[in-house]
Each structure stands twice: as C-alpha cells, then as structure tokens.
Regions:
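N-terminal secretory targeting modules
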Residues: 2-7, 17-189, 367-377
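Glycine- and acidic-residue-enriched helix-capping/strand-helix junction motifs
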Residues: 102-106, 200-208, 301-305
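Catalytic nucleophile-elbow at a beta strand-turn-alpha helix junction centered on a G-D-S/GDSL motif
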Residues: 187-211
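Structural recognition of the beta-strand scaffold that forms the well-ordered cores
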Residues: 189-192, 222-225, 248-253, 282-286, ...
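Oxyanion-hole/transition-state-stabilizing segment in secreted/luminal serine hydrolases
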Residues: 202, 206, 214, 232-277, ...
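A general structural detector for well-ordered alpha-helical segments in enzyme core domains, enriched
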Residues: 210, 266, 270, 307-314
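Short helix-loop-beta junction
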Residues: 211-224, 316
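Catalytic His-Asp segment of secreted/periplasmic serine-dependent ester chemistry enzymes
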Residues: 243, 291-377
C-alpha cells in the first residue's frame, strides 16, 4: 500500500516537473485593460452634435425628421475609431443598439467591427470582431501574438446596427492613445448620400463598404450618409450635408430608392441647398446600377431605365442652367458585365463593391482636382 502511495506521489511530482519545463519561457496569459473608445479619435461623421458618439444625425433632428430616417441615423455606418498602441493583442468589447439580423447579410457586417493597421502609409485589414449570436454585448480578439511595437489602428463600426458603447482592450503593460498620423486625412471630407447600398448592404464586414474602400484608397475621410430605404431627398439631409464646413466633394447616389417622379420633383431643390452653402464644391451624380434581374424582370427594367433617365435629366437641367463642377457617373460600369456582384439582385457583395469603386473612382478624382477644398499631405 505504502509503495503504491509513493509511486503515485513520484508520478505526480514528475508530471508537475514536466509541466513546468513545458511552460518555461511561455508568455503569461495577457491581462487586458479596457479603454472607452471615446478617449480616442472618432471620424466619419458629418456632425459631432449627436445624441451618442456613434450616431450619424444631429440630436436636433430627433423630433423633426421622419422616424424611419431617424432610426437609420443610429446605425454607425462609416464611423471609425482611430488610435495607436504597442499592445501585442487588441480586443474589442461593444454593445449593439438593436441586435439586428438580416437574412441576406453576414452578422459581421450588420453589427460587427473590423480592424485595420497603418503600415508604410497604407491601411491593411488585420482582424474582424464577430458579434455575439444571442447577446447585444460582444467581445472578440481582433488581433494577437504581435511584436510589442507602436502602430496606428482604425476600427470601423457596425453598418446596420447602432453601437451604444465600445471599449478597446490592450495588454496592461501597453501604451494606448490618440493617433499621431492624420490618416485618413481629415478636414475636407467627401460627403456621400445614398441608399442601403451606400450604407453597406450587403458586404461581409464594415471596412468593405464602398465609402470605406474609397476612404482608404484616397486617404481621405469619407462621410457615409447612406440610409436604407430612406434616401428620399429629404431637405434636412441636404442641410446636414451643407453644414459640413469644408467638404471636398458631394456624391448623390440616391436613385436606387427614388422613383423617377421623386427625382424629377425634388433633386434640383436638394442640390440647391448644397450649392447655396458651398457654391464651388463639386457634386457627383450617380445613376442607378443595372441590376442582373433586369434581364428577365420587365417591370424592374422599365423602372430603372426611368430612374436613370430622370437622373440624367436632372444633371442636364443643372448643366443648361450654367452650373459648374457637376459630374455624372453612368450605370453601365457600376457592376461587372456579367452582373456578378449582388447577394439578392440588388445589394452588393464585396465583389460588387469593388466594381462600384472602380467605376466611380475616376470621376471622384476629377472632382477632387476641381474642388477648392483640399487636404494636404
């Protein structure tokens, strides 16, 4: 009996010693300290006068704007947080406003986050925050196992849900603070107005929205004023766009939700609000994409053609009135020739967004050259 107890004790000590040797030199589990993201730089907003840090519409609009539009204003599409840290691990803890779900879009795009790192002047994707399935509060490690080196980071917030709180977790021995590099360059943003597609439907994660792709490609802040089902040329949105102090370019991409009669009735008045506030700022007008379903759906084909005819007539009206610095993007190249690029025939996948950006980029660059408001390198 004694020999059995002794053998067991020896075996236990041996196993403990082996475990100690195996763990020798291994780093201890990181102890994280969380920081409220509002301590850092929040970008991608037309105004800071919002109910919460991650809203897109002014608090003053709560009682005056349409309820549907106000609700979508809580969605944090296009908003980002910029910071720097030398932490070897970055974790996010965030709470969604609605806990939204859609059957044609990935949860990581609806209410997730993603992380980018600035390396030699360019932004690179480095991690995604996947939302919790059954809880509005989510925690996710965005990146880990890095060298302890100070880097500049950007977190894009959820596209189709609001964010009520966001905390960034870093190693307790790390330094974290506001960014030291102005990228994306701020001060003269591109202000884009549009529908669910512009809001980000239905890309896989927030950084793939085409406003964000343009933002990184041009190294310029882009304000996403995409409102799913609600880009109806409301004048309060025109006034919000006009309130941006030094916009570089305005982009009007509302045709996918505005029928031809609404475009005919309200576009010039909407444009006039922008032009009265900023007479020399270029305006880019974008046609309705040619959806793949147009091939067989006769009613949809006729509707889209009518909308684009109305959009072109709006542009021609401005041109004949002597308006300068107005630009037009036709529909033909907004999707690829085979029309592969949508999840449901309407909303763009990541592939569709890349085609869109390729199509609009030359016109936006031309407009930027003509703009009186430029950001310096």
């Amino acid at each position: 009996m004694k020999s059995r107890i002794l053998a067991t004790a020896v075996a236990s000590v041996t196993m403990l010693a082996m475990a100690f040797v195996a763990n020798a030199g291994q780093p201890e589990k990181e102890e994280l300290v969380y920081h409220d993201a509002t301590e850092f730089l929040i970008g991608g907003k037309a105004t800071q006068k919002t109910l919460t840090p991650y809203d897109r519409l002014p608090a003053s609009y709560e009682k005056t704007t349409r309820p549907e539009l106000w609700r979508h204003g809580h969605h944090s599409a296009g908003i980002y947080v910029r910071f720097r840290t030398d932490s070897p691990i970055i974790k996010a803890r965030w709470t969604s406003l609605y806990g939204a779900y859609m059957n044609h879009m990935a949860p990581s795009g609806i209410r997730g986050l993603d992380l980018y790192v600035l390396d030699e002047g360019k932004w690179y994707f480095t991690g995604v925050g996947r939302p919790s399935k059954n809880d509005k509060t989510s925690e996710y490690v965005l990146v880990k196992n890095m060298d302890r080196k100070e880097r500049e980071y950007m977190i894009y917030l959820s596209l189709y849900d609001g964010v009520t709180s966001l905390e960034i977790g870093v190693d307790k021995a790390s330094v974290i603070g506001k960014p030291q590099v102005d990228s994306p360059r701020r001060g003269c943003p591109i202000v884009m107005y549009g529908t669910s597609i512009l809001q980000g439907g239905c890309v896989s994660r927030p950084g793939m929205a085409h406003t964000s792709l343009l933002e990184r490609a041009l190294d310029m802040e882009v304000i996403n004023l995409g409102f799913s089902g609600n880009a109806l040329l409301d004048l309060d949105i025109a006034q919000l766009m006009a309130s941006v102090e030094t916009p570089a370019v305005y982009v009007l991409d509302n045709a996918p939700i505005c029928r031809a009669d609404r475009i005919n009735a309200h576009s010039v008045e909407f444009f006039r609000v922008l032009r009265d506030a900023h007479p020399d700022v270029p305006v880019v007008i974008v046609e309705h994409p040619l959806y793949p379903t147009m091939r067989l759906n006769n009613a949809e084909r006729e509707d889209i053609i009518a909308r684009n005819n109305a959009q072109k007539a709006f542009y021609e009206t401005l041109r004949k009135a002597g308006e300068k610095r107005i630009y037009y993007v036709s529909a033909e190249k907004l999707l690829d020739e085979m029309k592969e690029g949508t999840v449901d025939g309407d909303h763009f996948t990541d592939l569709g967004v890349t085609y869109y950006v390729k199509a609009v980029m030359p016109t936006i660059k031309k407009a930027l050259k003509a703009s009186p408001n430029k950001v310096g390198k």
